[in-house]
From Swiss-Prot:
Keywords: Carbohydrate metabolism, Isomerase. It comes from the Bacteria. The gene is nanE. It is an enzyme of class 5 (isomerase). The keyword Isomerase applies. Pathway: Amino-sugar metabolism; N-acetylneuraminate degradation; D-fructose 6-phosphate from N-acetylneuraminate: step 3/5. Belongs to the NanE family. It comes from Staphylococcus aureus (strain MSSA476). It catalyses: an N-acyl-D-glucosamine 6-phosphate = an N-acyl-D-mannosamine 6-phosphate. GO terms for biological process: carbohydrate metabolic process; N-acetylmannosamine catabolic process; N-acetylneuraminate catabolic process. Converts N-acetylmannosamine-6-phosphate (ManNAc-6-P) to N-acetylglucosamine-6-phosphate (GlcNAc-6-P). This is Putative N-acetylmannosamine-6-phosphate 2-epimerase. Coiled coil: none annotated. InterPro entries: Aldolase_TIM, NanE, RibuloseP-bd_barrel.
Length: 222
């Protein structure tokens, strides 16, 4: 089980300056030394490098685009197999109701339970309906990861109206809820923890210096 506390997302996509399994392992080490209780990471290679560097539970994902589907976070059993090989403690997957490129969501859950019974599963959702569906399918954790990042929630921010969407999710499911997506300040992190989430994932505000720099520059340009 993931501990209560701060999970730091250590990811860099191929077009980003820090794209490197070695660099992500050092980012994870910095997060560990700062007090993080877990890491969220993308790709088998990054996860293996991170697990060689820090003794923290890892939420693993594989981001991969597929034609004719907007689902790109651990979309099929191919990505699941890669994550099982990485020996991450938690596999996270897109649990939205969008059209999937291959297996259905419940088929993927069954696949993980069969092939990796000791691995927990996290649902990345965008709506309360999707949270309820994930709870019905037996996900161990439900994360607000994709709220604001789907075509039908675009422009919505997790912290709007004092985290009302997060409150709605917490009231709608019994599963452990993870706050993720636009938790961008220590005060926001404290607020979501006070609301009763099991843990919170913070990424860009900690591990994406290019984006952090752009925010500083932007305030003067605006």
């Amino acid at each position: 089980m993931l501990p209560h506390g701060l999970i730091v997302s250590c990811q860099a996509l191929p077009d980003e300056p820090l794209h490197s399994s070695f660099i992500m392992s050092k980012m994870a080490l910095a997060a560990y030394e700062g007090g993080a209780v877990g890491i969220r990471a993308n790709t088998k290679e990054d996860i293996l490098a991170i697990k060689e560097t820090v003794d923290l539970p890892v939420i693993g994902i594989v981001k991969r685009d597929y034609n004719h589907s907007d689902v790109f976070i651990t979309a099929t059993s191919k990505e699941v197999d890669e994550l099982i090989e990485s020996q991450c403690e938690v596999i996270a997957l897109d649990a939205t109701l969008q059209q999937r490129p291959k297996e259905t969501l419940d088929e993927l859950v069954s696949y993980i339970r069969t092939h990796a019974p000791n691995v927990e599963i996290m649902a990345d959702i965008a709506t309360v309906e999707e949270a309820k569906n994930a709870a019905r399918l037996g996900f161990d954790y439900i994360g607000t990861t994709l709220h604001g990042y789907t075509s039908y929630t675009q422009g919505q921010l997790l912290y709007q109206n004092d985290f009302q969407f997060l409150k709605d999710v917490l009231q709608s499911v019994d599963a452990k809820v993870i706050a993720e997506g636009n938790v961008i300040t220590p005060d926001m992190y404290k607020r979501v923890m006070d609301l009763g989430v099991h843990c919170s994932v913070v990424g860009g505000a900690i591990t994406r210096p290019k984006e952090i720099t752009k925010r500083f520059v932007q305030v003067m340009e605006d």
